[in-house]
Amino acid sequence: NKLLGNDLNAAGIELTMRGGTYRFRTTASFCITGADMQATLDGESVPMYTVISASPMQELKFKTAAKGMRTYLLVKGGIDVPKIMGSSSTFCDGKFGGHNGRALRTGDVLHLAEDCQADNFNSFDGKYIPKIDNTWTIGVLPGPQPTYEYLKPEYLDTLTSSEYTVNFNSARTGIRLNGPVPQWVREEGGEAGLHPSNI
């Protein structure tokens, strides 16, 4: 949004894993950030973190993300969707927000702000472009419960030294990891979510 001179809270499109195809019905300035999905505009490669001008009927196509997971398509002025609780985001599980409270479908028409052409093209310092990879180091903090009453100390060492993969059942509300199974101090009882006593 900053690159386009938009309000920082202007609505855009978040693309997860794969991007789809979008046709402009008016002249509009846009930019793409996040994971590189090898976008093309009428077959011509579109650079990331660069303001591009699209003409009516031009087609913007995305492939899939080779590294990273989410790509962001922003348009000058933002996408015209209602704000709910101060946010333009879509909450698919709750069926509200964004465009009709759901993921985009073929044939959907998104309305842009009246002024959707950038007057001047801001530059973006390359040092601020995040390095996106498929392997990440994440931090771990103990929760409010007394950790050592639930988990064996040796498992905590395993937890912080192992590699995990993201489970396909993950979503915005929570990430499930595949990796070493917790080693519990007690065989039954307790309140931890994954504990064998919890059904």
Please provide the spans of the model-predicted regions.
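Conserved "landmark" site that anchors the functional core of diverse proteins
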Residues: 1-199
